[in-house]
């Protein structure tokens, strides 16, 4: 993003609106905002929740940071992409919320695999286990929406991910970096990050998070 920022500043941004949809550390978003606004532009950081399919339908979840005026100016654009845009505070607030939002998802795939490991040798088949989990409070939206992907993965065929292991690992590392910068202890996240690092070393970066579950299930 720094390279893109430099190119924008060199081209001149006075009077323009810059919207950053990427997921960054809040401090990085704040630094970009300072440079862009110093150049005379409005800046909004608005990382989004969702993948390609909801984006095409305008069904993303937008988490916006910036001044009231900048976010108001950005809304006509963001409303084309998002079913909901929440203004969370100054620049960097959107990035902070996005990291908080993605952290439980990254942890979930490891937790799902560990839960399934309890069923090894029991005769309970994955189809039944996943169906029950998806039909209970143990089943987040991602499990209900991606049941077949999870089952195919558990059956032995890793599936391409719309939000793949590499992306999950990147956001998990950013969350840990944010926690460290603020003196927070995130023990579950630290341990899970090691599992993601191992998965990346095995060449699984392009696959769905369920591939992490499969390895954890054994």
Language-model-detected regions and their locations in the chain:
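Glycine-rich, highly charged phosphate/nucleotide-binding loops
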Residues: 1-7
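Rossmann-fold dinucleotide-binding core
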Residues: 2, 17, 23-102
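Residues within well-ordered alpha-helical secondary structure of globular protein domains
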Residues: 7, 35, 80, 135, ...
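Short, conserved loop/helix-junction motifs that constitute active-site signature segments
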Residues: 8-14
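Short, well-ordered coil/turn elements that cap or connect secondary structure elements
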Residues: 13, 38, 80-82, 121, ...
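A generic fold-level signal
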Residues: 13, 55-56, 204-207
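Short, proline-enriched alpha-helix->beta-strand connector loops that line the catalytic pocket
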Residues: 15-16, 115
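Helical "substrate-binding/catalytic lid" subdomain
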Residues: 94-216
């Amino acid at each position: 993003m720094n390279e893109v920022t430099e190119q924008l500043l060199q081209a001149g941004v006075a009077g323009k609106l810059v919207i950053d949809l990427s997921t960054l550390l809040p401090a990085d978003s704040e630094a970009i905002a300072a440079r862009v606004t110093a150049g005379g532009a409005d800046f909004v950081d608005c990382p989004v929740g969702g993948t390609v399919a909801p984006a095409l339908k305008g069904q993303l979840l937008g988490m916006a940071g910036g001044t009231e005026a900048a976010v108001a100016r950005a809304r006509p654009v963001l409303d084309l992409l998002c079913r909901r845009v929440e203004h969370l505070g100054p620049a960097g607030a959107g990035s902070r919320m996005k990291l908080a939002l993605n952290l439980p998802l990254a942890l979930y795939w490891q937790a799902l695999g560990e839960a399934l490991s309890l069923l090894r040798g029991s005769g309970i088949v994955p189809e039944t286990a996943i169906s029950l989990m998806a039909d209970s409070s143990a089943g987040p939206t991602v499990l209900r929406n991606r049941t077949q992907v999870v089952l195919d993965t558990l059956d032995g065929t890793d599936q391409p991910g719309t939000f793949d292991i590499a992306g999950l690992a990147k956001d998990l590392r950013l969350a840990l970096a944010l926690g460290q910068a603020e003196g927070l202890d995130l023990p579950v996240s630290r341990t899970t990050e090691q599992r993601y690092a191992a998965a990346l070393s095995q060449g699984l970066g392009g696959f769905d998070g369920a591939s992490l579950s499969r390895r954890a299930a054994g």
